[in-house]
Amino acid sequence: MLETAELYFNVDHGYLEGLVRGCKASLLTQQDYVNLVQCETLEDLKIHLQTTDYGNFLAHETNPLTVSKIDTEMRKKLCREFDYFRNHSLEPLSTFFTYMTCSYMIDNIILLMNGALQKKSVKEVLAKCHPLGRFTEMEAVNIAESASELFKAVLVETPLAPFFQDCMSENTLDELNIELLRNKLYKSYLEAFYKFCKDHGDVTAEVMCPILEFEADRRALIITLNSFGTELSKEDRETLFPTCGKLYPEGLRLLAQAEDFEHMKRVADNYGVYKPLFDAVGGSGGKTLEDVFYEREVQMNVLAFNRQFHYGVFYAYVKLKEQEMRNIVWIAECISQRHRTKINSYIPIL
């Protein structure tokens, strides 16, 4: 017998869950990837993609076809799917979808601010923004000279407003301060999203909390790695770490003191989930830390579909689709640049 919560889930969200599971079934198979890596030109790639769920998404693109055009059209297709889910959702799933868009909004804001710093035209930078993170006030981002101005002039009416409470500063937004702002926003965002999922309870919490814990720890590890050799102090580094992961609190304290990659690896070795990831870095495959993180993320998101009656399938599908898109872009770049030796270095999903 289904529990009451599960019965209610099906009444409110069962249609969309069935739909997203159907979408997941249309992800590229291993045989599709075998066919893609054999393509000689981007036009060949386009023809093969037409035989998959991507269909004729490039039909209106005139020659010459570029990797950038393929990437843009794939993003638009994903955005159309996401908008359909979101527009047909009821609360609290609607709020869950809003949380999902916040990470893209943060990336878009940072992209626009860096563009303004480099005196690029707003139109040029907007074209590079992710469609899932678009909002009406975006074009005004370039008028802000400090985090406080950015909040008051642009973000106060957006879903990002609550995450700005720890980021208020009158400091001029130079390149370093913009990067610090990105990490502080992500920290607040992940902690809030984690709390939302945990408070929701049921299977959504059981599936989403481990996924967000991993994302929080991944950010802490990548921030640490990227801070080596920079002017970022150890104290400032620690303030950027999300506190909703498995590394909190002791692991984060040790990471803040790390001097190099080996020191960082020793911290990770204390955690059963992260030791094998660090052990897999390098080796014969030449994998980077980012590669092994992506592989682990794919595994977790595939497993999310083994459970029913939860919101995690929507998050997992978007993440798996994004990895698929990265794979296609990687293969397309190798074909375009005639650099086929690493064409198989994509991350399989199914």
From Swiss-Prot:
Epididymis and vas deferens. Keywords: Hydrogen ion transport, Ion transport, Transport. Gene3D superfamilies: ATP synthase (C/AC39) subunit, domain 3, V-type ATP synthase subunit C domain. Transmembrane segments: none annotated. GO terms for cellular component: apical plasma membrane; early endosome; endosome; membrane; plasma membrane proton-transporting V-type ATPase complex; proton-transporting V-type ATPase, V0 domain; vacuolar proton-transporting V-type ATPase complex. One of its GO terms (molecular function) is proton-transporting ATPase activity, rotational mechanism. InterPro entries: ATPase_csu/dsu_sf, ATPase_V0-cplx_csu/dsu, ATPase_V0-cplx_dsu, V-type_ATPase_csu/dsu, V-type_ATPase_csu/dsu_dom_3. GO terms for biological process: vacuolar acidification; vacuolar transport. V-ATPase is a heteromultimeric enzyme made up of two complexes: the ATP-hydrolytic V1 complex and the proton translocation V0 complex. The V1 complex consists of three catalytic AB heterodimers that form a heterohexamer, three peripheral stalks each consisting of EG heterodimers, one central rotor including subunits D and F, and the regulatory subunits C and H. The proton translocation complex V0 consists of the proton transport subunit a, a ring of proteolipid subunits c9c'', rotary subunit d, subunits e and f, and the accessory subunits ATP6AP1/Ac45 and ATP6AP2/PRR. Subunit of the V0 complex of vacuolar(H+)-ATPase (V-ATPase), a multisubunit enzyme composed of a peripheral complex (V1) that hydrolyzes ATP and a membrane integral complex (V0) that translocates protons. V-ATPase is responsible for acidifying and maintaining the pH of intracellular compartments and in some cell types, is targeted to the plasma membrane, where it is responsible for acidifying the extracellular environment. May play a role in coupling of proton transport and ATP hydrolysis. Regulator of osteoclast fusion and bone formation. Belongs to the V-ATPase V0D/AC39 subunit family. This is V-type proton ATPase subunit d 2.
